[in-house]
Amino acid sequence: WDTGKAFDHAAPISAIVPVADVGELGARGLSLQINGQTRQDGSLADLIWDVPEILHELAKLYALRAGDLVFMGTPAGVGPLQPGDRFHAVLDGVIEHSGQIVDGPTL
């Protein structure tokens, strides 16, 4: 599931927040609005495995280092975005990130 999310022009991210500043991730909510409408709304508690379990298993396969990103899945509601769409993403109590989708290279 991790390598399927890592391809050219994929996975824009917000500012990186040090884990020491995050605290317990357990049941934090995550949400995504597109053009003012909620498209995704879920919780990290909905993951099949919790974050420490995922990192433990990945560490058996990869040399994880500070600053590495691990993509773990997403709540229901995944769909395509179009140039001009505006988004607002939230990880409760940690970060909010907003922006607009722009035209880019054809893949």
What is each model feature region?
Residues 1-61, 65, 69, 77-107:
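Catalytic-core "active-site belt" of small-molecule-metabolizing enzymes
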